[in-house]
């Protein structure tokens, strides 16, 4: 059960972000620490292999802390583990293990704007509160995940960190978690894009993925797990759905900063990656 989750989670979450590794290669990397090029594949991108291995470590690290309240340091630590040893870690402008210092967009969401770097610390207080207050309720789960992804606190790796975080928080409240599948990426991206107007797209996608993972759990560990799974919601959202720190239009000051160099005042929040990683 554990190995299956590790392989499926690492394969799907990385593949959604452009990894070229197959599920078989992901499995080989997990079980043997090595892999071979697939038929017709001339080369393996080093970062793909490193980030897959790092996802295994991040999942273990997360499980060791599953009952701890989420905070900035925990989230930044997961990012640091995911990006450790990659080419991106070598560029200080990328702020690996820290919140972003420059504006970025969500490419998969038709270049939609995200929260500006200067506003990320405040926005993350809202994100963290939504996860700490998470209930086994379809809207609550989808809202917390959407809030993280629209904040997009890191230069890269936001989807993977957000999905790890959601898995952790569902385990913390003893609710059925999920592994979002790459084959459903289109539905998932549409759900994130439309959530503010039509939350049902994302809610239904996440419920379907929880159904799939529940089937895996019941097949591989029947009668050995205890969890909640509430799949009903009334389709009526009483409050406005918004990320209060998200600006849908940027000006030059937003993009380039007061000094014209994109710098963001203040030290970045960095994660503590001590312990098993």
Q: What are the language-model segments listed below?
A:
Residues 1-156, 160-277:
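FIC/Doc superfamily catalytic core
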């Amino acid at each position: 059960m554990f190995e299956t989750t590790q392989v499926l989670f690492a394969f799907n979450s990385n593949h959604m972000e452009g990894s070229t590794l197959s599920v078989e290669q992901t499995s080989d990397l997990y079980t043997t620490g090595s892999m071979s090029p697939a038929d017709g594949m001339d080369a393996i991108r080093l970062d793909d292999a490193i980030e897959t291995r790092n996802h295994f470590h991040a999942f273990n690290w997360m499980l060791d802390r599953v009952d701890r309240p989420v905070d900035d340091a925990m989230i930044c630590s997961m990012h640091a583990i995911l990006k450790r040893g990659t080419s991106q870690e070598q560029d200080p402008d990328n702020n690996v293990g820290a919140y972003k210092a420059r504006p970025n967009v969500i490419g998969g969401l038709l270049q939609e704007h995200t929260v500006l770097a200067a506003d990320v610390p405040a926005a993350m207080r809202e994100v963290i509160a939504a996860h700490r207050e998470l209930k086994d309720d379809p809207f609550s789960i989808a809202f917390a995940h959407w809030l993280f992804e629209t904040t997009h606190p890191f230069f890269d790796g936001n989807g993977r960190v957000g999905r790890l975080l959601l898995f952790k928080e569902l385990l913390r409240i003893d609710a059925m978690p999920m592994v979002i599948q790459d084959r459903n990426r289109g539905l998932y991206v549409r759900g994130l894009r439309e959530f503010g107007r039509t939350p049902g797209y994302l809610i239904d996608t996440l419920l379907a993925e929880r159904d799939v993972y529940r089937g895996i759990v019941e097949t591989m560990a029947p009668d050995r797990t205890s969890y909640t799974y509430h799949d009903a919601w009334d389709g009526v959202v009483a409050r406005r759905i918004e990320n209060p720190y998200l600006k849908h239009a940027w000006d030059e000051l937003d993009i380039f900063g007061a000094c014209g160099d994109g710098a963001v005042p203040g030290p970045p929040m960095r994660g503590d990656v001590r312990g098993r990683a």
